[in-house]
A protein has these predicted regions:
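Active-site-adjacent structural elements that line small-molecule/cofactor binding pockets in enzymes
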Residues: 1-196
């Protein structure tokens, strides 16, 4: 069984917290997007650890574009020598439209396309495939060499998706590398709703 532990947002102490969690035998270190950015603590943790996965648990996908998260994911995966896991979640309509001032519609379909766009961007960077992603919600068709990362030895990070309902769970099964269950999810719910 793998067990992850969370770090706080105090950048003066997060590296020591991460090192302690790794020494205690945790499998991964998570950083959540609540009152602070979820990525910066993991950048600090990457410098003080060598074994544990570094996971956003979660980062709000719809507050950003796929290109922004492709860059962040690439940089953290490179900084951690391939240990970064991009944990994404949709959040709810009110937060996306009122707090982040971003569009909201069809969250499961949007998330599916978001992750496929990420993968298309990374395929351009890591496999040299042409960037020709055109969808209903996202379009990424321009990538010149100046904007493509050159430190690509670790490849793309894994993508996990937070899912509660059946539609987002289907998306996770289709396009993500793993699923993040909500903290209130029971064993019965996982068995009867999520797993089928």
């Amino acid at each position: 069984m793998k067990v992850d532990g969370g770090v706080g947002w105090d950048l003066a102490t997060v590296a020591a917290q991460a090192q302690e969690l790794e020494e205690m035998g945790y499998s991964g270190i998570t950083s959540a997007e609540t009152s602070h950015d979820p990525f910066l603590p993991l950048a600090f943790a990457a410098q003080q650890t060598s074994r544990v996965d570094l996971i956003t648990g979660i980062a709000v996908a719809f507050a950003r574009t796929p290109m922004i998260l492709a860059n962040i994911g690439h940089d953290l995966n490179a900084a951690s020598n391939g240990r970064f896991v991009l944990g994404l979640g949709s959040q709810i309509r009110a937060h996306i439209t009122k707090r982040f001032s971003m569009p909201w519609s069809n969250p499961a379909a949007r998330m599916r396309e978001f992750i496929l766009a990420l993968r298309a961007i990374w395929a351009n960077w890591y496999q040299g495939e042409a960037l020709e992603f055109t969808g209903k919600f996202y379009n990424h068709t321009l990538m010149t060499p100046f904007f493509a990362p050159t430190n690509t030895e670790h490849g793309a990070p894994r993508v996990f998706l937070a899912a509660v309902g059946p539609l987002m769970t289907e998306v996770a099964g289709e396009v993500a590398d793993g699923i993040i269950a909500h903290a209130f999810t029971t064993e019965k719910y996982l068995r009867e709703v999520t797993m089928p």
